[in-house]
From Swiss-Prot:
This is Cell division protein FtsL. Belongs to the FtsL family. InterPro entries: Cell_div_FtsL (IPR011922). It is a single-pass type II membrane protein. It comes from Xanthomonas campestris pv. campestris (strain ATCC 33913 / DSM 3586 / NCPPB 528 / LMG 568 / P 25).
Amino acid sequence: MSRLLLIVLLACSIASAIGVVYMRHMHRKLFVQLSKLEHSRDELNIEFGRLQLEQATWAESNRVDQVSRERIGMKFPETSDIVVIRP
C-alpha cells in the first residue's frame, strides 16, 4: 500500500514538474510575442505621429490657398463680384 502511494506521489510530482516546465516555456514564448507586439506598437505610434504632422502641413490654410491659386487658378472675388443674399 505504501509502495503504491509512493509511486502515485512520485507520478504526481513528475507531472507537476512537467506542468511547471511547460508553463514557464509558454510564459517565455508569450513574453517574446508581447515584446514584439510592443515594438510594433511603438513603430506604429511613431509613424502615426509623422502622418499627423504631414496631414497638418498639407491642411494649412496658406498651403491650400497656394495650391488652389497655382493648380486651379482660383482667386478671391472682387468686392463688386460679391453678392449678399439675405433670407
